[in-house]
Each structure stands twice: as structure tokens, then as C-alpha cells.
Amino acid sequence: MITLFPSLIIQQQVNSLSTRHLVPRGEGEFDFVWTHFGFADDTPEMAQRRLRQANLFGPAGFVSADDGEVIEFSQDGFRQAKSGSTLCELGGTGTGGAEHMVTETLIRSMYAYWRKVMGV
């Protein structure tokens, strides 16, 4: 699983490639869009297999929690007044390097870039 941007995740699980894309629809509202890929020459059996594998994840998935619901809960928890902002310090505040692998500097860097791109 690779998060390319806060709103775009690409995942390859078993024999399936999927994207998850968050599409903002307004304040406090978004669509959570899944796209599953296959090949034009897949047999009907392979297409069915890919669909079954795709269903391992998501709202009715057997493997992971529904990220859409988790994201919604997170947004509710971080909601502020229009002029407010939220800072979640999970082991620091910076975006510099660390001498260990257990760090959240990469995710903080991604969101710092997102804020720059979005102008917030």
C-alpha cells in the first residue's frame, strides 16, 4: 500500500490492484472512491477472483477496518472553528530526519506539503 497524497492510496493485495481516492464535496463531506483494475483479456473466472480479492478490504472487508469510517471519525475529532487549526503531536512536531524507523516525520512532511499545495 502506498499513500501518494492524503487523498490517493494505491494498493496491491494478492492478485488485485486498487486505488482509493478521497474526493472532497464540501465542508465535512467527502466521497470515498474505490477503483479496481484488471486486464481486458481476463477470463470471467479471473475477473470474479479479482472481485473477491478486492472485497477483502473496505466497508464489508474481512481484512481491514473501513478506512472511510476511520477518516470520518478523525475529521470529526479534529474539527475546529473556521479560523482554528489542529495540531496532533505524535512523537514530535518536526519534519526532519530521525535516527530510527519509528517516526511520523514522513506523514507530517506529506501533510505539510498538502497544506502548502492547498494554500491553508
Regions found by a protein language model. Give the residues of each.
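C-terminal catalytic domain of Rieske-type non-heme iron oxygenases
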Residues: 1-120
